[in-house]
Amino acid sequence: MNTEKIGNVVMNYDYYIGQDLYSDGDIEDILLDIVKNHDKSEFPNIIVESKSWPILYHLSEVRTNILNWYPFESDAHVLEVGAGCGAITGAIADKAEKVVAIDLSKRRSMINAYRNRDKENIEIIVGNFNDVAAGLTEKFDYVTLIGVLEYGELYIPGNDSYRTFLKKIAGLLKPNGKVLIAIENQLGLKYFAGCREDHVGKYFEGIEGYTTTNSVKTFSKKVLKEIIEGSGYENIQFAYPYPDYKLPTTIYTDDFLPVKGELVNNLRNFDADRMVFFDETKVWDTMIEAGLFHEFSNSFFVEATKPGEDAKRSEQTGQMTSFAKCSVERKDEYKIITRIFEEDGKKFVEKRAVNEKACGHVNRMAELAKTNPYLTENVCLVPCEAVADGVVQFPYIEGQRLDKAIDEAVKQGRLEDAWTEIRRLKDIIMNVSGKEKFQVTDEFRTVFGQIPQPEPAEGEKQAEPVDPLAVLEGYEAVKNVNMDMVAANIIFADKTYILDYEWNFDFAIPLKYILFRSILFNGTLNVMPEEQRKTLMELIEISDEEWQLFLQMETSWQQFVTGTSLTDLYPDMPSKYTIVKEENYCNNPPEPKCSIPYRAARKVKRMIVAALQKDK
C-alpha cells in the first residue's frame, strides 16, 4: 500500500497515476504555502489581506455551512467524493467517526491534508473516482457530492451519465445509507438577475439550456428529483441553502421557508462581474408570496436514501432538520449553529457551539433561563435545557409572532392596528424590572463605543474630542437585558414568550437601544413612507439624533462580534456589478437601436415569464 502521513492524515496513493490532470494553477501553490505555515485561526486575516476570490473560496469557514449543521451520527463513516482542497472535509471529520476523501489532484489533496493534519480520522485517496470506487471494499453510511454531480459527464461518459454516476454511488452505500448532494439550481434567481453561470462564466448559459456547453450541467428541482429517483433512491428531501451552497448562511426547507423581507444578502458575486437587472430582494418577496421560492432557490441541498432493511440506529436517527442558521462569521468564542428539528413528533430549537471556545457563550443561555430575569409573570423566556456542554435546546413554540402581526397590519393598511402592536412591543421592552440609571462603563464602551469622531469640514480645525455616549447617561437601563428582544422573537401563546436570548451582557444596556433594534430589524417598518415613519418615531420616542447614535453603536457591536464579514469584503474584491437602469429596459425605448443591457433585460423578462408558465 503506497501511503504517507501528513500530520495525522493518511494519504493513499494506490490509485495515483503520477500526475495531476486537474489544476487551478499557481493559486494552489499559494494555498499550500498558507496551510503549511499558518494556523486556521489566521485564515480570516489572510483572506482579508489577500482580497482574492480563490483564497476566500478555499479557506473561508463559511464553506463548511453546507454540512456543519447536518446531524451525522457520531459513529458514521463518510465518503467525500471530490474533496478538493478540504474546505468541508474537516467539518465532516468533526462530526463523524471516519472520513474517506477522494480527489484527482495530489496537490489539492496535500492542501486538504495540511489544513486538517490535527485530525486522526481522515484518509485521503488520490486518484480517479472510477478507479477508486472499483477498489473500495468498505460500504459507507454517507457519500457526499458537494459541487460534484454537475460534472457527472466527466466521471461517467455516456448518454445517461448522471443516473449512472448516482447508481455507482449507491453501490458504495450501506443499506439505508444516504447520498448528500449540493448543486446550483439551473433556474436560480441570480441567473435571471444578471449573474454568469457559475461553471462556464457565460450569461444565461444554464437557463437557456446549456446550448453551447457539454461536460457540466446543473438542473431544475423537477429534473434533479427525476434523476435521483431514476437512480433508485427514495425518501428524497430538498433543502435550500441561501444565498447559495458555496457560501451559505441559512438552510431552508419546505417545512420552514423564508418570509418576505428576509432575503437581503444577494450581491455575492465574488468570483466574476455581473449585471443587476432588478432588485433581487423585491423579486424574492414576490416569489415567496407566490409560493415559488423552492423553484428559484439559487442552490439545492438534497438528501436521498438507498433502499435497504438494515438501517442502523444512533443518537441522531429520526431527527429531521427543517431549518439551520450557521453563524460562523464571528469571533471564535461566539460561533454557533441554530437548528430547528423534529423528533418523535415534537419540534425543538437547538443552539450548538461550533468550537470549544464558544461553549461558554451557549451555556450562558441555559443559566439565564433558570432565573427568567427582569421579565413579568406573563412575559417569559422560552424554557431552555443544557443537553451537553455547548449545546442547549428549547421547545418550538407555536403562536402568533409579533412581527407578522405588525407586517400584516401595515400591508393591509390597518395602521392603527400596527401602532397598537408597536405599543405592545414598546411596553414589553421598556417595562422590564431591575431598571437603573445608565452610566457608561469601560465594558460597555469596549462593545458599543467604538464610534469614530466626526471629520471636520474643509478648512476647519479638528474639534476637541467628544464622547458620543455621554448623552446616554441617566437613561433607563438594565443589566443582563436580552439584546434579541425584537418583534420576530416575541410570540403570543398561553403566555408572551421571548424566543431567543443568545445575546446579553452583565453590564447595563439602555432600554431605548433595545427598542431601536426591534424597529431596525423589521423590514416592513424600515421601508415605511416618510409620514408614517415620522409617526412611528414619535410613538417609540426616539429622536433622529438618538437613532443615528444607536446605528453607530450597532455597527460597533457587530464589529466586536464578527470582525470582517463576507459582506464587508465584497467592495474590496476585484469582481464588480453593473446596475442596468430602468430607462435602459423600458417597454418602449426611445431609440430603435437597443443597447446590450436592454436586450439582456428583455431576454430576462421573457425567461422569467416562460419559467413561471412552465411551473403552472
What spans do the regions from the language model cover?
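ATP-binding glycine-rich loop module of kinase domains
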Residues: 325-370
